[in-house]
Amino acid sequence: MITTERLHLRPWREEDKPVFHALANTPAMMEHFGGPVPQAKHDAIVDRMIDQQARNGHCMWVVEIRETGEMAGVCGLRIGGHPNTPVPEELEIGWRIGEKFWGQGIAREAAQASMAWGWANTDRPRIAAWTVIDNKPSWGLMKRLGMVRREDLDFRHPDYAEGDPFGAMIVYTIDRPA
């Protein structure tokens, strides 16, 4: 578990599935993912995170508010796992923070802690992040974290059909500190 001033970042548990679905499946939260989805799709995401934690020792962890234990969202690191893209095995940082917590610096606090963990616990030369071009809050955070746009690494996400605007990913990276 990672602890910050206001947050706990922890591995997933089976009982997180319905809580995550309720948090993440609103029209605003799913705006840049193509809209709300059935619970089974979010359950599959949680299953992948549990598997990644077991295999790699990290994943995009549950973000909890320390004071209340309430799930605020997701943030952490995973191995990209997108073959046939410019980022097939990148150490990816990502986040999804619930609407109730927007504008409070939760994503930044969780992302900074995740990046610090990544530098301390992996030998990766850089950390990458990607999102759709219209997701200005996400790439704005990437910039505030010190990440740099890498147009040479932009790609089509394999989970989206050709021509689907949600599949056009822009990439930011940050190099390991000296």
Model region roles, listed by residue range:
Residues M1-E31, V62-A178:
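Acyl-donor (CoA/ACP) binding surface of acyl/acetyltransferases
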Residues A28-I50, H58-W61:
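Conserved GNAT-fold acetyl-CoA-binding loop/helix
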Residues H42-Q52, A120-A128:
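Short, charged, low-hydrophobicity "junction" segments
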